[in-house]
Amino acid sequence: MTKKILGLDPGLASLGFGVICTESDNLELLDFGIIQTPAKTDIGKRLQIIYEDLHQVLNTHQPDVVAIEKLFFYRMGNTILVAQARGVVLLVLAQHQLPIIEYTPAQIKLALTGYGAADKVAVQEAVARELCLDCLPRPDDAADALAVALTAWFQR
């Protein structure tokens, strides 16, 4: 059975997305990238950009399930901004009536590298290896989103 998995790495400045297609043990990379919002733009407008662009990603790829990274931050100010963006993401996913799976950063690192405290490069190398990419996926937020999607596939 073919299944499309959309991985999301929520952020206000840059929201990463990655779409993979799976069929039994076969895996195909369909698309990855970021939804970017201008830093000096009003917060309401930035959230609107995320809202509209995420709808476009969902309409283009029609995923069967969405895997999203759970919120985990060190700086309080940044956490609040990301939480606002994450709220918009969850609203859009609810509007599309999509099942959502959430993973912590440690769960994602463990699934991809076998080590829950792996660094970003180790995770990106694992993503590149699993998807047979010639180079590490960029930007970082898109690579993180692909890692989330792969985690959902591994946990099936």
From Swiss-Prot:
One Gene Ontology molecular-function label: crossover junction DNA endonuclease activity
One GO BP annotation of this record: DNA recombination
PROSITE patterns: RUVC
Matching SUPFAM superfamilies: Ribonuclease H-like
Disulfide partners: none
Any one annotated GO CC term: cytoplasm
Protein origin, superkingdom: Bacteria
Keywords from the UniProt entry: Cytoplasm, DNA damage, DNA recombination, DNA repair, DNA-binding, Endonuclease, Hydrolase, Magnesium, Metal-binding, Nuclease
Residues engaged in binding Mg(2+) 2: E69
InterPro entries associated with the record: RNaseH-like_sf (IPR012337), RNaseH_sf (IPR036397), X-over_junc_endoDNase_Mg_BS (IPR020563), X-over_junc_endoDNase_RuvC (IPR002176)
Enzyme class at the top of the EC tree: hydrolase
Protein localization: Cytoplasm
Gene3D superfamilies according to UniProt: Ribonuclease H-like superfamily/Ribonuclease H (3.30.420.10)
Cofactors: Mg(2+)
Enzyme Commission identifier(s): 3.1.21.10
Binding-site positions, Mg(2+) 1: D9, D141
Function: The RuvA-RuvB-RuvC complex processes Holliday junction (HJ) DNA during genetic recombination and DNA repair. Endonuclease that resolves HJ intermediates. Cleaves cruciform DNA by making single-stranded nicks across the HJ at symmetrical positions within the homologous arms, yielding a 5'-phosphate and a 3'-hydroxyl group; requires a central core of homology in the junction. The consensus cleavage sequence is 5'-(A/T)TT(C/G)-3'. Cleavage occurs on the 3'-side of the TT dinucleotide at the point of strand exchange.
The family this protein is said to belong to: Belongs to the RuvC family.
Subunit composition and interactions: Homodimer which binds Holliday junction (HJ) DNA. The HJ becomes 2-fold symmetrical on binding to RuvC with unstacked arms; it has a different conformation from HJ DNA in complex with RuvA. In the full resolvosome a probable DNA-RuvA(4)-RuvB(12)-RuvC(2) complex forms which resolves the HJ.
Protein name stated in the entry: Crossover junction endodeoxyribonuclease RuvC
Native source species: Acaryochloris marina (strain MBIC 11017)
Lineage of producing organism: Bacteria, Bacillati, Cyanobacteriota, Cyanophyceae, Acaryochloridales
Gene behind the chain: ruvC
